[in-house]
């Protein structure tokens, strides 16, 4: 069984991420979308890592060979634990390539059995990031072209709670 891992922060998962997930899912027997926890950023995200995993599970529910998980270990070690042979990485721009190749080389030093494959972003998602989606949501923009419909209300509600907290209002 060929298992691949698509690591990222996914705060939140976007339609660009989902596009990569769907394309990668047809290439592997099993695809694990793994929320990577950066200890330096653990309290700075919109959603907790556990909430992100739950959002991803809802979004990929109809993809039978895709699952969501969370890890705070090195991705190369996590891949070894899961017996994964491949990391999936999305590239939005040429500028992403240099950093991702460096990371791929480091990961293969840690886990020589691990390859990295790159999926170029679909043209309509090259500009899209979780940060862009969150910023648009803060200003009540239509999110249909940015986020999976299953999670739009979650993002809006979370931002509303954050806004209330910043304004000193209680919910």
Which residues make up each language-model segment?
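Nucleotidyltransferase catalytic core that binds NTPs
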Residues: 1-171
